[in-house]
Amino acid sequence: MTTESQLPLRSPDDVGYLRNISVDSASPDFEHEEANVKAVFTAMDQLMRTPTLVAGAVMPDACPTGDATIPVGGVVVAENAIHPGFHSADICCSVMATDFGRLHSPKNVLDVAQSVTHFGRGGRKRSAGIFKHLTQDLEDRIRSNPLFTAGDLKKAQLHLGTQGDGNHFLFVGESENYGGVTLVTHHGSRGFGASLYNKAMKIASRYRETISPETLPQNAWIPADTEDGQQYWEALQIVRDWTKLNHQVIHRLVAAKLGSEVFQDGVATEATFWNEHNFVFRKPSEDGSGPDLFVHGKGATPLDDSYLPDSHQGLRLVPLNMGQPILVVKGETSATNLGFAPHGAGRNMSRTQHKRIRRATGMSDQEIFDEETLGIDARFFSGGIDISELPSAYKNADQVQQQMEAFGLGTVVDRIQPYGCIMAGSPKSVERNRTN
């Protein structure tokens, strides 16, 4: 039972959402696609009953992350509310591209990148000296925000220049438009952001118990107009700036070792651009008289320039899988997209299910790897193969692109054709082979 001061769940179908996803009955993976889409819709149907939500959308790469909560490839708009669970623990997971032109071979760039990047849990050794790249301004902002501790500052220092594991990658390819060699990194805010997320979920839980006990714990929110909300919003901006720097550190190290001048005095030129795809964005209400709206994208690429204060020519990156090109797209808010595009190819099944199906063929992991990476220079940082990150683990890339076009989810203006990529690899092997 709710009291008059509490917010109950909305009635089913009270707030609808845009369904930018379909199932191809002719697809060889039809059974898994259909099950995945049904699960996404079931989760969204329940999620949209959350009392703060006023709009939502799902992208072609959508896949569920649990019952009645936002799927990967989901976008929801909340009134005066920041939902930590809707951007997940990997706050500001993002992609950055640097165009190195045609002076360096793709292999050279990939070799150099492998020598300077870092995958796996935790951060770098202090002796590596990467922590010195943390700017004084960022350090001061971290120290001044009450949501961060001395331990968080340490993570902000030691996790700089690291990429983590899972689906994070370092990709090298060539522009389809003119042949320039491009480096793309994909990762988030690492332990620094995860620590903030854990605190925010606890704060949101306290508000949920008072404001809306019927709301599921994973969908709890922090009222944006409270002191907690204001501090959290500022903390999110700090994490965003740190994550951008995290990408830049890796790109700078590669450029320095190549002798490239794409970074001048450590500052990126127009050769570099980036975008997040796990974040929350703020905008005024439709008529300007109501409370601010907070647009949450979990695995969704913001197209609208109003979401990105540092947009470069409106360009965005949509990676698919290691064997497919990374799409360079542009777009605007439309009646179908809420200002977003997919963030990648997405999955039709869990990692465990994919591994079981692939291994049921009787092939070894090495044989599966050799078959799926033919023609690309795919590397695992740990040396241990992780078949759950091979192309077959993801949705059909062509179908995702077709649905992007069909639903008006951005326009492809270039493709970065794959030469090769680096991913973390087998978790046990990552820890065993850590050197920096």
Description of each model-found segment:
Residues 2-44, 51-59, 64-72, 76-88, ...:
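Domain-length cofactor-binding catalytic modules of enzymes
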Residues 100-102:
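Acidic, low-complexity central loop/insert segments
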Residues 97:
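N-terminal glycine-rich flavin-associated loop
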Residues 118-147:
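Acidic low-complexity segments
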